């Protein structure tokens, strides 16, 4: 009954029912580790609701959706769907495809060195190495200059790859570092779900990067962990970068 009353899809619960029936001891252990909704209830209490967009932004988005509907009707349903869920549509934005991690990371580092107002980074993996060493110097220098620097990274994605000493160095110069869903807080449950797999960088609200590239040497093929690494991303310049 406990599993049945848990929030979630019935198909998800059915898998747990079958596992508990076939192997009760193993099923109970696995449910205790990964199956419950305790973390689902815990995380919302520690997150803040994203502020609503100003009305002017919403109005510009509606105008952009109307324009898109007329010019590219096939995309109108997608645009309207996103807007209904508070994802606004922006115009006046150029998009550059970056086919390799080395290209994206080089581009990101060069743009970060020119930041004047802020640098925001959110990544699943921030791994110490040549890429990080170069980026860290820029982030610390910019923080000393008064540029707002904020970093969010996933704790599980950085186990043994991003040290406490590095975090201390960043915080000493004014960089705000937030660790998403720290693993040590859930060691009794070993929750490996609810990770932050985003790879987003935003610089001054004018330039943004996203895609499949984390900040780690293997993504630039400086080191080889799993063979030649092929991942890509995009650079947005303009209103959409905000």
List the model feature ranges, each with a label.
Residues 1-242:
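N-terminal localization/anchoring segments of enzymes in phospholipid and broader phosphate metabolism
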């Amino acid at each position: 009954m406990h599993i049945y009353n848990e929030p979630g899809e019935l198909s998800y619960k059915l898998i747990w029912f079958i596992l508990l029936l076939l192997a009760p001891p193993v099923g109970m252990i696995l449910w205790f580790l990964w199956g419950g909704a305790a973390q689902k209830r815990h995380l919302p209490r520690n997150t803040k609701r994203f502020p609503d967009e100003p009305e002017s932004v919403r109005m510009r988005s509606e105008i952009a959706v109307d324009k898109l509907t007329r010019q590219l009707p096939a995309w109108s349903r997608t645009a309207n769907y996103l807007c209904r869920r508070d994802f606004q549509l922006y115009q006046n934005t150029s998009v550059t495809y970056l086919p390799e991690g080395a290209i994206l990371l080089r581009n990101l580092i060069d743009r970060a060195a020119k930041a004047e107002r802020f640098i925001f980074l959110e990544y699943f993996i921030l791994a110490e190495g040549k890429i990080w060493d170069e980026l860290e110097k820029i982030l610390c220098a910019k923080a000393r200059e008064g540029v707002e620097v904020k970093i969010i990274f996933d704790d599980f994605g950085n186990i043994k790859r991003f040290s406490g000493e590095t975090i201390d160095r960043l915080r000493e110069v004014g960089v705000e570092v937030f660790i998403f869903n720290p693993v040590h807080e859930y060691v009794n449950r070993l929750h490996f779900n609810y990770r932050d797999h985003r790879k987003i960088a935003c610089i001054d609200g004018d330039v943004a990067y996203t895609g499949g590239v984390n900040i780690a040497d293997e993504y630039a093929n400086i080191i080889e962990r799993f063979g030649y690494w092929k991942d890509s991303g995009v650079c947005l310049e303009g209103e959409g970068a905000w």
